[in-house]
Amino acid sequence: MAWLTHRPIGLTHSESGSDGGYTLFSSVRGHHASIIDPQGQIVHQWHHPEGIQHVKLLANGHLLIQTLPPADAAGREKIGGSAGAMIELDAEGNTVWEHRDITQHHDYVRLDNGNTLYLAWELMPQAICAQVRGGHHHDDDPELMWGDVVREIDEAGELLHEWRSWEHLDFNEEVICPLESHKEWTHANSLEVMPNGDWLISLRLTSTVILVDAGSGDIKWRWGGSQAHNEHDLKRWGPAELSHQHNAQRPANGNILVFDNGCHRKRGPSYSRIVEINPETYEFVWSYSNPTVLAFYSFMVSGCQRLANGNTLITEGASGRLFEVTVDHQVVWEYISPWTIPSPFGPSPAVFRSYRIKADDPRLAGYALSAANYESLNTAIAAGVLQTEPDYHEPETQPTL
């Protein structure tokens, strides 16, 4: 989405019909994470000196953050979404657990047994790289491409299991978009664990969502990509309807919900939308896009969340816009992130993802949530004063978040 140089920040719209509750978010490459109330007032913050890429509130009420990669991270390609560590913070910001892996990226899940799943990159064998289709080549392409891996570690950080995507993906089905580079194959950007333990993974570069059998590692279900070439493929995998999507998930109704970013669409302009499909029939159940098509677009990051009352919280990530829509597409709540952070694209308000939390959620029991604790900050935001952070050294990042 394009925006005015002097645009409003903070809460810009609220009306009846919102699901209410608190909203958790952080700025991409910032050093803070915030909880805001329905009025857009900051009621709690965490800070971390290593920077923050992504945050999630755990079942125990702690915050699990993914930090920025270290500037001197030798042996790691500088790819968008890269991280350095997962760090668990309590309500006061104290570190209670951490795991460092400079190949981790984008997303992670704390399991009920205390183990943690996360996405990582690994260089693929030359024989595999030679078979990857699509993308455009440059003279400076690396000899080996990066492939996606899912790792499971225990509470001590010991590796228990590792799934290498290239051992299960089909070269003819996972074809890189022709407008993307040949540096990596799939660029996974979201990971969700299904009720039966299987993994739902979004693959950005091939515009595909896959369901992985957690036991065998096989691909059980697939949506999108370049596979819908004939009637057999269409029946097997569904229509190719996605374009560099993020945040694939399964709402309580069993459907699949996705933020479809919309870069490099085959026909027409680039625009974003939220899409919900029935995974059995691939039929569209619900979708959201702006009637003024170009008014809703994020070329990177972004997400969505189905709320208890049926509304959907949407993170239009590149512009830092968080908004809630009803089933009938009415916007009932909107908030613009007040932070701008140094980035490869200039000062950026980007938010990777946001999460709505009910006011009576037991995970908040240990928090003294109060706008009064951040009175001066809330006053400045209400007055339209942009919040900035000092410049800091950061490795170059590809625009493929």
Predicted region positions:
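Histidine-/acidic-rich catalytic cores in large beta-rich domains
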Residues: 1-401
